[in-house]
Amino acid sequence: MSKTKTPMASDDINDRSGGTNPSLQDCGMYVFMDEVDSDSVAPIIEWILEQNYVVPVAERKQELLLMICSEGGELASAFALIDVMRSSAIPIKTVGLGQIASSGLLIFMTGAKGRRVLTPNTSILSHQFSWANEGKAHELFATVREYDLTQKRMLEHYRSCTHLSDAKIKEFLLPAQDRWLDAHEALKLGICDKISYPQQTEPVSKSTTKKVKTK
């Protein structure tokens, strides 16, 4: 289902340019602050493809920057973007800020090795996928196959991004209940590579991180 976006939606933020000033996309940056669905990820996919195939070779960026603040959304749309990110010849740095949750976290973890940055006050939510379905018995039984495939995709993605074993992933990142993390807990679990403010080069020490209290 398509939704009406506010005037400050991600595509407006990234396309704005005053006069002759370049837009964020022109500078190799994209700010994603939205739910994850086909409408919201399509502009990011197009941006990555344009940077790889449309921009003249001599003008291509050495690195792309994708900043993410998302409460999550559709898994299929997330994996569509993830596959495009992984196929990019230009490394993609990811910066998580505000909140990266559910499928938004999956997208963040896909950033280039050593280039996944969390800001100190970012909230991280990792949990099992949820799925609502209806239909006749034989239709629901057929859907079980996709449940199994989705679970396999999730585990493979977490494993490749964190280098944790399946047992540890299920215990610390995909347990039965939601798992909220602060930036330093995420760092220890291999979700990110560094904790820093977007324009800061030195990592932020643990003492400066605001702790997140969860219910």
Spell out what each predicted region is.
Residues 1-215:
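Terminal-region recognition feature
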